[in-house]
């Protein structure tokens, strides 16, 4: 159900297990419809690019939504306004963190690491322990395969 290769790549990087170079955030659904009410009280459907279900070793669970930043992906004032309205509806209609990610952010491994930190901090779900000494190297290698510009 991915709408773009970038969505698939981001889902892989964030949710694959550590041994495959991912950040092991949890399970992911691409473009899962979410029913909510808009600011006028109307029932609407919004579709974030990624819906990630995180859980820790004590089975605490949290949900995070991710979208590409509309100001970066769409041009034109009306489209940007519509995209921002959609984002605001998600933030107020669903009781979970919502993050916007731009293509520019994905060009920096450190930026992706920062996004993962923000996701974990916003949910209170800590990273699972690992004994892998080369974890960052594996993550950097996967990121480079998926996002590094040639």
Regions found by a protein language model. Give the residues of each.
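Surface segments flanking catalytic/ligand-binding clefts of nucleic-acid enzymes
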Residues: 1-150
């Amino acid at each position: 159900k991915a709408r773009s290769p970038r969505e698939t790549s981001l889902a892989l990087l964030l949710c694959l297990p550590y041994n495959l170079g991912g950040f092991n955030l949890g399970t992911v659904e691409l473009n899962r419809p979410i029913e909510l009410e808009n600011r006028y009280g109307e029932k609407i459907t919004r579709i974030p690019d990624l819906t990630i279900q995180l859980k820790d070793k004590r089975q605490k669970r949290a949900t995070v939504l991710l979208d590409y930043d509309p100001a970066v992906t769409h041009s034109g004032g009306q489209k940007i306004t519509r995209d921002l309205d959609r984002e605001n509806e998600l933030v107020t209609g669903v009781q979970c963190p919502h993050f916007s990610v731009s293509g520019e952010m994905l060009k920096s491994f450190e930026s992706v690491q920062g996004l993962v930190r923000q996701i974990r901090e916003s949910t209170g779900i800590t990273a699972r322990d690992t004994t892998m000494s080369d974890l960052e190297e594996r993550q950097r290698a996967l990121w480079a395969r998926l996002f590094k510009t040639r």
